[in-house]
Regions:
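Acidic/His- and Gly-rich active-site-bordering loop/insert found
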Residues: 2-108
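Active-site alpha-helical elements of protease catalytic centers
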Residues: 107-118
Length: 118
């Protein structure tokens, strides 16, 4: 597989991925209260043309694309821990920040950035 071709194709999604991640950061979602994050992710899956999207009784978002003998699965979580004392933050954790090389905010490294990348 040509890494440069894959990387070039991925670059075409950068703007949409950044917007999706920034949207997720802005939505509070502590454990068992991440329903609004799930709704935003579901909307993104619909936009991307997933064949089937379900939310199970536990609130897990399940998306399906394609068919075949082999299955590729991705498992992640969107809940976050509380922000604690706002005065301890150098930036608003629910607004986050963006530079040329990074996006910061509540949940970006655990695990919303990975979910957006998948």
């Amino acid at each position: 597989m040509d890494f440069n071709a894959v990387n070039a194709a991925a670059e075409g999604y950068r703007e949409d991925m950044v917007k999706f991640l920034r949207d997720l950061v802005k939505i509070p979602g502590e454990s068992a209260e991440e329903g609004n994050k799930i709704a935003r992710a579901k909307a993104e899956m619909e936009k991307l043309g997933f064949d089937k999207i379900d939310i199970d009784p536990q609130g897990n978002l399940l998306g399906y694309m394609g068919s075949g003998e082999k299955l590729i699965a991705f498992d992640g979580h969107m809940d976050t821990v509380g922000i604690g004392e706002m005065s301890n933050w150098k930036f608003d954790p629910y607004d986050g920040y963006e530079t040329e090389t990074e996006i910061g905010g509540r949940g970006t490294s655990d695990q919303e950035g990975g979910i957006v990348s998948a």
